Structures are given as structure tokens and as C-alpha cells.
Amino acid sequence: MSDVEVGASEDWCREHARVVARSFYRGMNLTPADRRAGLFAVYTWMRAADDAADDLSADEALPALTAMRVRTERIFAGRWDGRAASDLAVTPSERGRPAQRFWPAFASAVASFPLRGVWFDDMLDGLESDAVALPGEVRFAHSSALATYRHRVGGVVGLACTALWGVREAGMWGEALHLADARGRAFQLINIARDIGADWKVGRVYVPRSALERHGVSAAMLASWEPSGACAALIRGLVRHARAELVQTWRYERLLAPDCAAAAWALKASYQGIAEVLENDPERAVCGRRARPPKWAKALIAARALTMRPWMVNA
């Protein structure tokens, strides 16, 4: 791959993240310039995989994700040079579409940062399980089973971000990766709580059977918000569990490279904002506007991250 090809791919990934990631783009953009291109490339890889699982039928999604896995493995093995035009496509029907323009930037990120192929394998495993799930199926019996899924599609995001951001000292890698996985799993639980209604509409149920039974509701009852008191208690329970997990990761920013801590803290603060909205108005999980912090709060998060170093004084 030429520098021109990589640069064009990185530019495309940045613009894609700006349009698609929306509010989280602010947090990602706090990453220093020398690491930002890698972050956008990895984000775009993850978004492409997620879109394949979400937007294609199972018969289409599984081959697409398998092709993506093969290409990713080749990149990590150093056996993809990007010269074959056909190698830019996930499936023959995708050939030439702009959504595949992230591969040169992703390959450059893999070559430049200590990313691990197993993380991306894990994410694809999680997304494949989404693609084959039966509509309306309660997939997880207990929270322990959900925890594995949360690692695959949430914890892996934290691990990859840590590899891109780097740590303050070499001896901090182990703890930083452990906390990154935990934080990503907490973020994913907030995502699950926020998107219960939207997920139900496409036949997906992530709330464990044990939680539904504890509150005396079915997945269908939760999606229709009846009875409201039990449904609200369930949502608040999920959110409080996630917030408790986030508290346990308070040291994470202190382990990161100093110039990357602001980006990590801003993303955490954004998710805390989503959690607060859901605690105050849990019905937003199934109807009304998608739960997110107000615009003024997003601006304040970015300003605080840049000027106040809040992770040094707050847990």
C-alpha cells in the first residue's frame, strides 16, 4: 500500500466517524493526532462488522463476517498488501462500495499499534451470535452468560482503544487492559438498557432471563412497558449495575498515556450521562427520543476533559 492510499483511507475513516459516531466523535477527536487516525480506522472496522450483523439477513451476514475475519487475520499475519481490488470487498455484492475503504487505514493501524488479532476475532464471534439469534429469543439465562457477550462486543472496544492510546509506563499494561475490558463491558450494558425497545423491534433480546423473572416480566412486556413499575425497576437495575462497574474502573485514566486520558474520560462521562437519563426516565429505553446527554452537557464534558483533568480528582 502506498502512503497516498493509506492517507486517503484514513481521511475517509475520519469523515465516516464524524458522520456516524456523532456525539462520541467529540470524545474520539480528543485523541492526539498521531493516534487519532488509528482510532478512527478501528472504529470504522467495528462499525462495518456491526452493520453486517445488523443490516443483512443471517444467510448474508455470516459469509460477510467470515470474509471480514479472513481478511483481518491476513492483515494481522502481515499477508495483506491491499493491492488486489477484489480484496476491498466483504462479499462480491459489496465490491467497490465506499464502506470498504477502511481496510488500508485499518492495516496501517495494525502495523503501528499493539493491537491483538484475538480481540477482533472475539468481536466477530459476538456479532455472529447476533446474526444467528432467533427473533424474540431470550439468549442469556443469567448475567454471567451475558458477560461473555459484553466482553466480545464491548470489552474488546476498550482493549483496542487502550492499545491505541498507550499507557503511562510499560508496567501498567496489564491493569490498564483489565480495566479497559471492564469499562467496555459496562458501556455495553448501558447500550443494552438504552436500546431495549429498538432491539425488540428487530427481534433481539439481551436482558437475561433471570432479570426478567426477578421483575416478573417477559421480554414482550418490557418492550410494551407493562407493568410500568416493574419495567422501570428492571431498567434502573441494569443501569445501576453498569454504573457500579464503571466506578471500579476509576484508575483507568491514570494508567493511560497522559495526552490520551482526556479522550477516555470524555467517553466515560458521555456514558454516565446516558445512564443518568435512563435512571431519571427509564421509559426512554423503549419509547421517545433515544437516551443521550443534552447538547450543553456534551460541550461541558469536552471542555472539562481538556482543561480540568477531572480523572485526577474524581473516581
Functional labels for PLM-detected ranges:
Residues 1-187, 193, 197-315:
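Catalytic cores of Mg2+-dependent Asp-rich isoprenoid enzymes
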